[in-house]
């Protein structure tokens, strides 16, 4: 009889351990729920998506309103095209809204931040519908580029003179003579 009780307790413990392992796996896979809410699809094209991945969150002010459904390469422009699945209850997003790739923390995962624009029928703005494209996008900031800008003082402009010697100070028209010569 005592052996039967021990077997039941071991079975309960194993079942609890399996449920805990399943919970951890779902959290690690970033699965928020088993049920699916109705969504609509939006598209956006970026110059550089960095480490953005499918299933990355789309948020407005820190609140997750959707997910990245797919990332493909546009066959005409060869730019990354991101497909977004936005929850249907957030269906009043103006077409003046912008989308930027951000990183949670210094080296955390990347997500899409949706900055809601303004709606003004007199200016011809509209609400984004299923299948529309967000025009105003800001690409991911690449850590190596930021470090390079900091180290070399670049402001993001093209570095066509980066290997040139520094120019003479204005008003200094003095020329240098080789050593051993006199003026």
UniProtKB/Swiss-Prot annotation:
Any Gene Ontology CC annotation: membrane
One function term, GO molecular function aspect: phospholipid binding
Region listing for MCE/MlaD, in residue ranges: 39-116
Transmembrane segments: 8-28
All ranges on the Cytoplasmic side of the membrane: 1-7
Keyword Ligase set for record: no
Phenotype on disruption: Mutation leads to accumulation of phospholipid in the outer leaflet of the outer membrane and increased outer membrane permeability. It confers sensitivity to SDS-EDTA.
GO annotation, biological process: intermembrane phospholipid transfer; phospholipid transport
Residue intervals on the Periplasmic side: 29-183
Top-level taxon: Bacteria
Composition-biased stretches (Polar residues): 172-183
Similarity field: Belongs to the MlaD family.
Record remark: domains: Forms hexameric rings with a central hydrophobic pore via its periplasmic domain, which also binds phospholipids. Contains at least four binding sites.
Quaternary state and interactors: The complex is composed of two ATP-binding proteins (MlaF), two transmembrane proteins (MlaE), two cytoplasmic solute-binding proteins (MlaB) and six periplasmic solute-binding proteins (MlaD). Interacts with MlaC.
UniProt-recorded name of the protein: Intermembrane phospholipid transport system binding protein MlaD
Annotated source species: Escherichia coli (strain K12)
Gene responsible for this protein: mlaD
